[in-house]
Amino acid sequence: MAVSNNNNNNNSKERTQNIKEVEEKLGENPKITLKGGGKTKIMDFEQLRKPHCVRPSARFPVEDTAGGLLRTGGHRPQISDEEVSKRHHEQSHGQEDH
């Protein structure tokens, strides 16, 4: 087991050395190029660390977990009885013509 621990320590030291070398090559303000959707954007790493959305999302009351349909005053939106009869009438007359 001593050999295994020794190998792990060597690998860790090599990784640390590699990271230091890469950081030296990149300099103080490293840039990254992102390509997608036919566009190319050059960003620095600090921009990637920052959140993309500066506004926090709205918090909904815990007891209201039914989703967006019930956030309209506590009831599901419905069409009126008149609209239901009108649509039923239009559908039944539309089928007779065919």
From Swiss-Prot:
Lineage top rank: taxon: Eukaryota
Disordered: region residues: 58-98
Name of the molecule in the record: Uncharacterized protein YLR361C-A
